[in-house]
Regions:
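Mobile, glycine-rich extracellular loop/lid and propeptide segments
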Residues: 160
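Sec-exported extracytoplasmic/periplasmic mature domains
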Residues: 95-98, 143, 147, 173-180
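Surface-exposed patches in mature extracellular/periplasmic domains of secreted proteins
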Residues: 102-104, 156, 182-188
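Residues that flank catalytic or metal-binding motifs in active/ligand-binding sites
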Residues: 117, 150, 167
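Gly/Gly-Pro-rich "capping" loops immediately C-terminal to redox-active cysteine motifs
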Residues: 88-91, 95, 103-139, 153
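Post-cleavage N-terminal segment of exported redox proteins
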Residues: 11-87, 141, 175-191
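Positively charged n-region of N-terminal signal peptides that target proteins for export
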Residues: 1-4
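An amphipathic alpha-helix signature
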Residues: 131, 135-143, 165, 169-172
């Protein structure tokens, strides 16, 4: 019991130190006076998540440059250097509830009725092309959406270790390859 309490205090102390990187004295005071459970949850967040929480997912302009730079520094690329992998594997990842589950938030899947939390991705590759810039942008948003959209609810698939760089490249291929069923078949529910 005593050892567990000491461990919890040590973790809270380290988290508090990390949070101080972003938070001012007033914010830290509010966290510490919000109650034990609140402080434990809040202080156990990663510093970037804590920053989003403090600012209710709307970062002030003066924090954006550093935040975006830090988020972009987290992006890792496939060992092959190729940002488009196998679209068939990408389709299996995109449409799998236990993998990326992209269709739950985005409309455009030819396999499942899509959600509307995120933007429609219907015929994504046909509308945007497959240029290197489009491949890079698509890969980076999937890897770490916060590098472009700070504090968005979209999973940060690579940054959070949910998908490997190679799996993300497969999803990019699924979205962009003109031969992919994502671009050749109608989306479920399309008119």
């Amino acid at each position: 019991m005593k050892k567990a309490l000491l461990s919890l205090l040590a973790v809270a102390f380290v988290a508090l130190g990390l949070a101080q990187h972003y938070l001012g004295g007033r914010e830290l005071e509010l966290i510490q006076t919000g109650g034990k459970a609140y402080a434990e949850v809040f202080l156990n967040q990663r510093p970037d998540q804590a920053l989003c929480s403090i600012h209710k997912n709307r970062l002030p302009a003066e924090l954006l440059p550093q935040f975006l730079e830090e988020q972009r520094s987290l992006i890792k690329y496939p060992a092959s250097g190729k940002l488009m992998g196998d679209w068939k594997k990408g389709g299996a990842i995109f449409n799998n509830l236990q993998k990326a589950n992209c269709f739950s938030c985005h409309f455009g899947s030819p396999v499942h009725l899509g959600g509307d939390v995120g933007p429609s991705l219907e015929k994504y590759g046909l509308k945007r092309g497959q240029s290197e810039a489009v491949q890079r942008y698509t890969y980076e948003v999937i890897y770490n959406s916060w590098a472009y959209f700070p504090c968005t609810v979209m999973y940060r698939f690579g940054a959070q270790g949910l998908l490997t760089p190679e799996e993300i490249a497969d999803v990019v291929a699924y979205l962009l390859d003109p031969e992919s069923e994502f671009n050749t078949k109608p989306a479920v529910g399309s008119r």
